[in-house]
A protein has these predicted regions:
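Feature for soluble, non-membrane regions of globular proteins
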Residues: 1-159
Length: 159
């Protein structure tokens, strides 16, 4: 549309308005799928595990907090972010794809809690079972790599 000289059109303005939703949806799905792998253990993420244990008291308590965010009465994403300023890991619920992302925070663990993620296999009331399956299939090596990159101020690639 830019090349066609339609930058001032309503259609172009609408595409710009929706760009954050569409693009962030793609990016968050890339993060989500990149971190899934059966047979991994949180022990493969020693730095991440130590950080959440120090901050939350244990990795299990951190996980319960993330699941609590994921069970919010809405659809969206549960994301464990790293705050590079404070060094803290924060669990957040993000509605849609672009609403609620914290500027400057780095996503470490991303859980898709839109219905399409669990309805086919776990049905309408199966969100808790789906969340357990995601945790069981988390690729903790990817989480550790994200954590180490974020902690050192590097930007990690989505895929």
């Amino acid at each position: 549309m830019r090349a066609a000289g339609k930058v001032g059109s309503l259609a172009y303005a609408d595409r710009r308005r929706r760009f954050g939703f569409e693009y962030n949806g793609m990016v968050l799905h890339e993060y989500y799928f990149a971190q899934l792998k059966p047979g991994s253990s949180i022990d493969q993420a020693p730095g991440f595990k130590a950080a959440v244990t120090e901050q939350f008291g244990s990795a299990e308590v951190w996980h319960e907090d993330l699941v609590s965010a994921a069970k919010s009465r809405s659809v969206g994403w549960a994301i464990a972010y790293y705050d590079g300023t404070t060094g803290q890991i924060n669990n957040h619920f993000i509605q849609l794809h672009e609403d609620g992302n914290v500027g400057g925070f780095v996503p470490l663990v991303i859980v898709d809690v839109f219905e399409h993620a669990y309805m086919v296999d776990w049905k309408a009331l199966g969100r808790a079972d789906y969340l357990a399956a995601v945790h069981k299939n988390m690729n903790w090596g990817v989480v550790e790599a994200r954590f180490q990159a974020a902690r050192s101020g590097q930007i990690f690639k989505r895929f």
